[in-house]
Amino acid sequence: MQQILTNIVLDKTLSTEGYVVVPFLEESHVNTLRDFFFENHAKDIPGFYATAHSTDIAFRKKMNDKIKAVFENSITNYFHNCLALGGSYVVKSKSQEERLHPHQDWNIVDESKHRSFNIWVPLVDLNENNGAIRVVPRSHLWVDNYRGPNIPDYLGAFNENIWQHMQTLNMKAGEALIYDHRLFHASYPNKTDELRVATVFGIIPQEAQMYYYFGDGDAVNVYESSVDFFMEGNIQKGPEVLKKVNTISAPTLTKRALPDYINFQEVKETPIEEIKQVEEKTNRLGWLKKIFR
């Protein structure tokens, strides 16, 4: 297994548990990022908002450049031989009343060879009232699957079961949740009058090729991708100018270590149309399942 973190103990925990929480930004850096956000945004933010979803590419880059500059030293200190991809502000306001359901982030590398990660850093202290993150330790080892636009979420029907078994991370401003993109995670709604402002940043091993996985009926098309595509393209619309390198016909969901509260046989036998209906009803925020969550 590739070493991701410079600290061997933390690296082992990341590998076995799927995540670690570490001190990451000094208070002055937290204030810098928070002030920069409010300097460039109105106070009223509707629902869930991410700068990476802006249609203004120059604005996306401006937000990314600031986050990257502030994160740079901490990334150098914590990560071993990794490539820093890009960052986004992710903000929850009181008007987003529903929770973000349990989910995994998209595949962006060949997970049979490499792993990919997010660095998620709140700029305010978190609790259950203002949008704290929840995780399922070791859930990154549950299944081998493909995740991306137009690819059904086969475990979506078990959202409530998964939620009941999650652990809440009441993080402090400036701490970082470093997690494997395969890890099941979710978050509470923000019930307070203050915005829950956070930042997220993608990381992959230096030698890993980026890929974009796009569902096509019963198949999954695989395209060579890049940081520029995720930063500048409209990744919801499809591969656009990317080079297709493979088509995986009728990809299977492979069980590795599912817990007892998820019936694997039921998952495999659920009709695809039923899976899509569950996604529409319970995960209207499914478009968030990307590198910049």
Region annotations inferred by a language model:
Residues 1-111:
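Non-heme Fe(II)-dependent double-stranded beta-helix
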Residues 4, 183, 188-293:
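Non-heme Fe(II)/2-oxoglutarate
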Residues 19, 114-118, 130, 163-168, ...:
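Extracellular structured ligand-interaction cores
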Residues 26-29, 90-92, 107, 126-128, ...:
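Short, solvent-exposed loop/turn segments at secondary-structure junctions
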Residues 85-87, 98-100, 115-121, 131, ...:
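Generic beta-strand structural signal
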Residues 103-104, 153-162, 195, 214-220:
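Short, surface-exposed loop/helix-turn segments at secondary-structure junctions
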Residues 111-128, 201-205:
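Short, conserved beta-strand element in jelly-roll/cupin
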Residues 128-188:
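Double-stranded beta-helix
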